[in-house]
Amino acid sequence: MNKTSKKHLALPYRPGVGMMILNADNKIFVGKRIDTKISAWQMPQGGIVPGETPSIAAMREMLEEIGSSKGYIIAESKCWYSYDVPSFLIPKLWDGNFRGQKQRWFLIRFTGTNEDININTLNPEFDEWRWASLDELLSIIIPFKRKLYQAVVKEFESLIQ
């Protein structure tokens, strides 16, 4: 259970984007975070730079995290989704200025090949990657993001089938 202290509840959410990137087989790109010893898998995500639109941020983050921008946006989430990070992580992330993230999510069709993906980017976030089914995605995801992922899957599921 994610316990968030009253002090941390007063902090704002960091604005960001998340990307559900689909290959031709409707499998979803997931990466294993490089900065933790536990097996923490997630879809690519990142912050929005001031003055940047969420859709521009999504395509920039895709390039930064998977080393390719070969793809196009199928859909944008109808709302902002948010999650809180566990209290012990707050001081370690974003200089302790945010309690979690509020994100606009994008369903993106990847048009490249596996060879186009390069997670050894300038600032790598993943040390492994793979394509996962919807069911796999929800079972391997880091627990404090699971509720958000369930909501994103529910919103985009009809477009994936």
Curated annotation (Swiss-Prot):
The gene is rppH. GO terms for biological process: mRNA catabolic process. It comes from Rickettsia bellii (strain OSU 85-389). Belongs to the Nudix hydrolase family. RppH subfamily. Keywords: Hydrolase. Residues 12-154 form the Nudix hydrolase domain. It comes from the Bacteria. Its cofactor is a divalent metal cation. One of its GO terms (molecular function) is mRNA 5'-diphosphatase activity. Its EC number is 3.6.1.-. One of its GO terms (cellular component) is cytoplasm. A motif (Nudix box) lies at residues 46-67. PANTHER family: M7GPPPN-MRNA HYDROLASE (PTHR23114:SF17). This is RNA pyrophosphohydrolase. CDD domains: NUDIX_Ap4A_hydrolase_plant_like. Accelerates the degradation of transcripts by removing pyrophosphate from the 5'-end of triphosphorylated RNA, leading to a more labile monophosphorylated state that can stimulate subsequent ribonuclease cleavage.
